[in-house]
Amino acid sequence: MQYDIASIIQGYAQGYFLMADDNDCLGWYGSRDRTLIPLDERFRYPKSLQRVLNQERFTVAINRDFAAVVAGCANRESTWISQELQEIYWLLHQTGYAYSFETWQGEELAGGILGIVIGGAFIGESMFYRIPEGSKVAMVKLVERLRQREFVMFDAQMMNPHLERFGAYRIKDKEYKTLLEKALLSSSTLI
Protein backbone atom coordinates (compact mmCIF):
# COMPACT_ATOMS: atom_id res chain seq x y z
CA MET A 1 0.00 0.00 0.00
CA GLN A 2 1.19 3.53 -0.77
CA TYR A 3 1.31 6.11 2.02
CA ASP A 4 1.70 9.84 1.71
CA ILE A 5 4.34 10.59 4.36
CA ALA A 6 3.80 14.37 4.09
CA SER A 7 0.07 13.92 4.84
CA ILE A 8 0.81 11.66 7.79
CA ILE A 9 3.28 14.15 9.25
CA GLN A 10 0.76 16.93 8.65
CA GLY A 11 -1.80 14.97 10.69
CA TYR A 12 0.60 14.70 13.62
CA ALA A 13 1.56 18.38 13.20
CA GLN A 14 -2.12 19.27 13.59
CA GLY A 15 -2.31 17.37 16.89
CA TYR A 16 -3.80 14.06 15.76
CA PHE A 17 -2.37 10.57 16.12
CA LEU A 18 -2.92 7.26 14.33
CA MET A 19 -4.46 4.23 16.02
CA ALA A 20 -6.06 1.02 14.85
CA ASP A 21 -9.39 -0.01 16.32
CA ASP A 22 -10.37 -3.54 17.40
CA ASN A 23 -10.94 -4.46 13.74
CA ASP A 24 -7.47 -3.20 12.73
CA CYS A 25 -9.00 -0.22 10.90
CA LEU A 26 -6.59 2.68 11.05
CA GLY A 27 -7.86 6.15 11.89
CA TRP A 28 -6.85 9.57 13.14
CA TYR A 29 -7.67 10.42 16.74
CA GLY A 30 -7.49 13.52 18.87
CA SER A 31 -8.16 14.28 22.49
CA ARG A 32 -9.68 17.14 24.49
CA ASP A 33 -6.92 16.58 27.04
CA ARG A 34 -3.38 15.71 26.03
CA THR A 35 -0.77 14.14 28.29
CA LEU A 36 2.75 15.55 28.37
CA ILE A 37 5.89 14.29 30.07
CA PRO A 38 7.55 17.32 31.67
CA LEU A 39 10.98 18.31 30.40
CA ASP A 40 11.59 20.59 33.38
CA GLU A 41 11.90 20.11 37.15
CA ARG A 42 8.43 18.53 37.30
CA PHE A 43 9.83 15.33 35.77
CA ARG A 44 10.27 12.75 38.51
CA TYR A 45 10.67 9.02 39.01
CA PRO A 46 10.66 6.54 41.90
CA LYS A 47 13.71 6.37 44.19
CA SER A 48 13.99 2.67 43.42
CA LEU A 49 14.62 3.59 39.79
CA GLN A 50 17.49 5.86 40.84
CA ARG A 51 19.21 2.79 42.32
CA VAL A 52 18.81 0.98 39.00
CA LEU A 53 20.24 3.99 37.15
CA ASN A 54 23.20 4.12 39.55
CA GLN A 55 23.95 0.44 38.85
CA GLU A 56 24.36 1.22 35.13
CA ARG A 57 22.88 -2.14 34.14
CA PHE A 58 21.57 -0.73 30.87
CA THR A 59 23.10 1.07 27.92
CA VAL A 60 21.12 3.40 25.69
CA ALA A 61 20.89 3.45 21.90
CA ILE A 62 18.84 5.24 19.28
CA ASN A 63 17.54 3.22 16.30
CA ARG A 64 19.86 0.27 16.95
CA ASP A 65 16.92 -2.08 16.33
CA PHE A 66 13.93 0.02 15.32
CA ALA A 67 11.96 -2.96 13.98
CA ALA A 68 12.33 -4.87 17.26
CA VAL A 69 11.05 -1.88 19.26
CA VAL A 70 8.00 -1.54 17.01
CA ALA A 71 7.37 -5.29 17.32
CA GLY A 72 7.80 -5.11 21.11
CA CYS A 73 5.32 -2.25 21.36
CA ALA A 74 2.79 -4.09 19.18
CA ASN A 75 3.19 -7.47 20.93
CA ARG A 76 0.37 -7.24 23.46
CA GLU A 77 -2.85 -9.06 24.12
CA SER A 78 -4.76 -5.95 23.08
CA THR A 79 -2.93 -3.53 20.80
CA TRP A 80 -3.76 -0.49 18.72
CA ILE A 81 -0.58 -0.96 16.64
CA SER A 82 -1.85 -2.92 13.64
CA GLN A 83 0.32 -4.43 10.93
CA GLU A 84 -0.54 -1.46 8.71
CA LEU A 85 0.55 1.00 11.40
CA GLN A 86 3.81 -0.93 11.85
CA GLU A 87 4.45 -0.45 8.12
CA ILE A 88 3.75 3.28 8.45
CA TYR A 89 6.17 3.54 11.38
CA TRP A 90 8.83 1.84 9.26
CA LEU A 91 8.29 4.37 6.43
CA LEU A 92 8.38 7.25 8.92
CA HIS A 93 11.63 5.80 10.28
CA GLN A 94 13.14 5.55 6.79
CA THR A 95 12.24 9.19 6.12
CA GLY A 96 13.72 10.44 9.40
CA TYR A 97 10.56 11.00 11.46
CA ALA A 98 10.17 7.86 13.60
CA TYR A 99 12.76 6.81 16.17
CA SER A 100 13.31 4.09 18.70
CA PHE A 101 14.96 5.07 21.97
CA GLU A 102 16.27 1.81 23.42
CA THR A 103 17.82 0.28 26.50
CA TRP A 104 20.09 -2.72 26.17
CA GLN A 105 21.53 -5.18 28.65
CA GLY A 106 24.57 -6.54 26.89
CA GLU A 107 23.33 -7.72 23.49
CA GLU A 108 19.71 -8.07 24.63
CA LEU A 109 17.11 -5.41 23.93
CA ALA A 110 15.72 -4.55 27.38
CA GLY A 111 13.05 -2.03 26.42
CA GLY A 112 12.28 0.96 24.33
CA ILE A 113 10.14 3.91 23.42
CA LEU A 114 8.75 4.45 19.93
CA GLY A 115 8.24 8.07 18.93
CA ILE A 116 7.82 10.53 16.12
CA VAL A 117 9.94 13.67 15.97
CA ILE A 118 8.64 16.80 14.26
CA GLY A 119 10.65 19.91 15.02
CA GLY A 120 10.96 20.21 18.80
CA ALA A 121 8.14 17.77 19.51
CA PHE A 122 8.76 14.17 20.53
CA ILE A 123 5.45 12.34 20.14
CA GLY A 124 5.64 9.14 22.15
CA GLU A 125 3.65 6.44 20.42
CA SER A 126 4.30 3.48 22.70
CA MET A 127 6.82 1.79 24.97
CA PHE A 128 7.62 -1.74 26.10
CA TYR A 129 10.10 -3.77 28.09
CA ARG A 130 11.51 -7.28 28.04
CA ILE A 131 13.73 -6.87 31.10
CA PRO A 132 12.23 -5.26 34.22
CA GLU A 133 13.01 -1.53 34.46
CA GLY A 134 14.10 -1.43 30.79
CA SER A 135 11.38 0.98 29.65
CA LYS A 136 11.62 3.09 32.82
CA VAL A 137 15.33 3.65 32.31
CA ALA A 138 14.57 4.48 28.66
CA MET A 139 12.07 7.11 29.85
CA VAL A 140 14.60 8.81 32.16
CA LYS A 141 17.37 8.73 29.56
CA LEU A 142 15.04 9.97 26.82
CA VAL A 143 13.97 12.96 28.92
CA GLU A 144 17.65 13.73 29.55
CA ARG A 145 18.28 13.56 25.79
CA LEU A 146 15.29 15.75 24.93
CA ARG A 147 16.48 18.35 27.45
CA GLN A 148 20.01 18.31 26.01
CA ARG A 149 18.64 18.74 22.48
CA GLU A 150 16.32 21.56 23.59
CA PHE A 151 13.03 19.89 22.68
CA VAL A 152 9.92 21.91 23.46
CA MET A 153 7.61 19.02 24.35
CA PHE A 154 7.29 15.29 25.00
CA ASP A 155 3.75 14.33 24.01
CA ALA A 156 2.60 11.08 25.62
CA GLN A 157 -0.90 11.39 24.11
CA MET A 158 -2.97 9.65 26.83
CA MET A 159 -2.52 9.40 30.60
CA ASN A 160 -1.98 6.12 32.41
CA PRO A 161 -0.76 5.26 35.94
CA HIS A 162 2.73 4.40 34.66
CA LEU A 163 3.19 7.87 33.15
CA GLU A 164 1.82 9.60 36.25
CA ARG A 165 4.80 8.27 38.22
CA PHE A 166 7.06 10.35 35.96
CA GLY A 167 5.14 13.56 36.58
CA ALA A 168 3.00 13.37 33.43
CA TYR A 169 0.26 15.97 33.33
CA ARG A 170 -2.74 16.84 31.17
CA ILE A 171 -3.34 20.03 29.24
CA LYS A 172 -6.39 21.17 27.29
CA ASP A 173 -6.40 20.86 23.52
CA LYS A 174 -6.10 24.62 22.91
CA GLU A 175 -3.00 24.88 25.13
CA TYR A 176 -1.58 21.73 23.53
CA LYS A 177 -1.95 23.12 20.01
CA THR A 178 -0.27 26.39 21.02
CA LEU A 179 2.67 24.45 22.47
CA LEU A 180 2.77 22.18 19.42
CA GLU A 181 2.94 25.22 17.11
CA LYS A 182 5.93 26.49 19.11
CA ALA A 183 7.57 23.04 18.93
CA LEU A 184 7.10 22.86 15.17
CA LEU A 185 9.13 26.06 14.77
CA SER A 186 12.09 24.47 16.56
CA SER A 187 14.86 22.70 14.69
CA SER A 188 15.71 20.20 17.45
CA THR A 189 17.05 16.81 16.45
CA LEU A 190 17.20 13.59 18.44
CA ILE A 191 20.47 12.41 16.89
Curated annotation (Swiss-Prot):
GO CC term (a single one): cytoplasm
GO biological process terms, semicolon-separated: protein catabolic process
Compartments in which it is found: Cytoplasm
Kinase as UniProt keyword: no
Primary location class: cytoplasm
E.C. code: 2.3.2.6
Cited function: Functions in the N-end rule pathway of protein degradation where it conjugates Leu, Phe and, less efficiently, Met from aminoacyl-tRNAs to the N-termini of proteins containing an N-terminal arginine or lysine.
Protein name: Leucyl/phenylalanyl-tRNA--protein transferase
Organism: Trichormus variabilis (strain ATCC 29413 / PCC 7937) (Anabaena variabilis)
Taxonomic lineage of the native organism: Bacteria, Bacillati, Cyanobacteriota, Cyanophyceae, Nostocales
